[in-house]
Amino acid sequence: MKIQFLGAAGEVTGSRHSVEVMLPGGSRRFMVDCGMFQGGREASNKNLELFPFSPKDLSFVVLTHAHIDHSGLLPRLCAQGFSGPIYCTSATFELLKILLPDSAYLQRADVERAERKQKAGKWRGEMPVALYSREEVDLALSQF
C-alpha cells in the first residue's frame, strides 16, 4: 500500500490523501478526503494546482467529514474526470449539499468583486479564480 499526503501535512488545511493498494493483477487508487487549502494567496495557488495523478484513475473517494478543508475540492476533482462514487455518512452528505454550493457562490462573488474593483482602478495584485462552478458542484453531488 502506498499513501501519498497531498495536503494537511505540515499544515492544517487541504486534507487529501491518495491511497494505492496493490492487488493481484494490478492496483487500485482511491482518495481519503479532497479538501481545499485555506488562508490567503499561497493557499489559493495550491488549490489551483493539478492533482499529481489523473482523477480518471481513481476508483472512489471516502470523506471523513464535511468541512471544506476535507471536501472543498471534490467539484474540481469531478470536473477533471473523476467519475466514481464518493462515500460518506448521510449527515456529511446533508451538510455538503449546503457547503459546496455556498463555496462555489463565494468564489464567484470574490471574482465579481475583484472585477468591479479592477474596472474602477482600485484592484491591485492577482485576480482571484473560481475553482469550480455550481454546475460542477451538482456533478460532484450526483456521485454520492
Predicted feature locations:
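Eukaryotic helix-linker segments that join adjacent hydrophobic helices
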Residues: 141-143
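In a subset of proteins, long, contiguous C-terminal domains/tails are tracked
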Residues: 1, 12-14
